[in-house]
Amino acid sequence: MTRIALGLSYDGSSWQGWQTQPHGQTVQDTLEAALGQFSGTGAPLDTLCAGRTDTGVHAAMQVVHVDTHLNRRAESWVRGVNAFLPSSISIHWAKEVGEDFHARFSARSRTYVYLLWRGRVRPALWAHRAGWCFQPLDVTAMRQAAQALLGEHDFSSFRSSQCQARHPVRHLTRLDIAERGSFLVFTLQANAFLHHMVRNIMGALLQIGQGRESVDWMASLLRARDRRLGAPTFSPDGLYLSAIDYPTLFELPDLDGGSSLLAPFTA
């Protein structure tokens, strides 16, 4: 058996999340079917991913691995599998890796970017690709509140009731808020994320930005470890899985591909 790592992007608005579902249109099901068609067997090939995205969440760079008996050049994987995929999913690169590589467990960190449009009316050209807030936001207060979340914490106040993670402790190493014209760009990096963690953090930051809660509320919410005390879960529309960090020994290509796709906002 050969293990192949694949880097891909997708428009999450077309799909009911990454993970396979019995009666759902998911990225995983569609990719595995395309891999089966490319292999010539017609039977879906099982994949494992770096991070399972929810319904409506996009990926500028997702990484998966697949075990196969096929012997093909990297470019054949890219062009061949893309030929069986819809336009909302695209393979960017492929690389043969050793059995010691695992798309999920070998990853050292994941980075998400959230694009938020600030404007009086919703942006039609950014429908499903950016979140929207029409109220004025105190960006300074939001940045101050974000500092309370950096480091290793129990993020129970920011996990969904459906979260299947074995424990709620995560290490958040980055939470930046940049202003890019009418957009606010939120960049979050952690060793891993809980279900709805980024969207629940976004909800809390917006409560503070709108003056509904104080800057200190973020720290008290974190200490409470109670999701019922948090803000509503924010829209998935502007959320992008943008980068996966792996040890250099795996020599994976174009791991900054997601950052490149979002470069007008993150540069």
UniProtKB/Swiss-Prot annotation:
Gene3D superfamilies per record: Pseudouridine synthase I, catalytic domain, C-terminal subdomain, Pseudouridine synthase I, catalytic domain, N-terminal subdomain
GO molecular-function term, one example from the UniProt record: tRNA pseudouridine(38-40) synthase activity
Pfam families: PseudoU_synth_1
Active-site residues, as the UniProt record annotates them: D54 (nucleophile)
CDD domains: PseudoU_synth_EcTruA
Binding-site residues, substrate: Y112
Annotated keywords: Isomerase, tRNA processing
First-tier enzyme category under EC: isomerase
Subunit record text: Homodimer.
UniProt family annotation: Belongs to the tRNA pseudouridine synthase TruA family.
Name under which the protein is recorded: tRNA pseudouridine synthase A
